[in-house]
């Protein structure tokens, strides 16, 4: 019997871009656009992970899936990604509410 190493599942976690501390501060419109792009990219990644999990679930239910662990990994990845997205959303709402409570001048 041959023993092989564990194959990667093809997941590459999102890594935030590195900032150069010597760069001047950009205007708020540029920073807002970059933040918006990051949010949209994160939601697109979440949707892709959930779609993969759903596709593998259908294959598992119909008997077309050869390795059930592929579905288990995809379902867990989708669950963790969803939990992370909800946590980020909650923190963003907390920050927004805190800013709204700040007194003006």
UniProtKB/Swiss-Prot annotation:
Location comes to: Bacterial flagellum basal body
- Species source reads Nocardioides sp. (strain ATCC BAA-499 / JS614)
- Which InterPro entries does UniProt cross-reference here? FliE
User: What one GO molecular function would you report for this record?
Assistant: structural molecule activity
BP GO terms, sorted: bacterial-type flagellum-dependent cell motility
Protein name, UniProt field: Flagellar hook-basal body complex protein FliE
Question: What keywords are annotated for this sequence in UniProt?
Answer: Bacterial flagellum
Cellular component GO terms, alphabetically?
bacterial-type flagellum basal body
Family, according to the entry, reads as follows: Belongs to the FliE family.
- Identify the stretch(es) annotated as Disordered: 10-30
Tell me where on the tree of life, at the top rank, the source sits: Bacteria
Q: Does the keyword RNA-binding apply?
A: no
**Is Lyase among the key words of this record?**
no
């Amino acid at each position: 019997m041959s023993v092989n190493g564990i194959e990667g599942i093809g997941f590459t976690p999102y890594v935030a871009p590195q900032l150069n501390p010597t760069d001047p501060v950009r205007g708020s419109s540029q920073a807002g656009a970059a933040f918006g792009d990051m949010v949209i990219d994160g939601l697109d990644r979440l949707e892709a992970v959930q779609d993969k999990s759903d596709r593998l679930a259908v294959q598992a239910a119909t008997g077309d899936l050869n390795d059930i662990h592929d579905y288990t990994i995809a379902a867990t990845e989708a669950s963790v990604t969803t939990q992370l997205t909800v946590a980020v959303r909650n923190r963003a709402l907390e920050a927004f509410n805190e800013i709204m409570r700040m007194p003006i001048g």
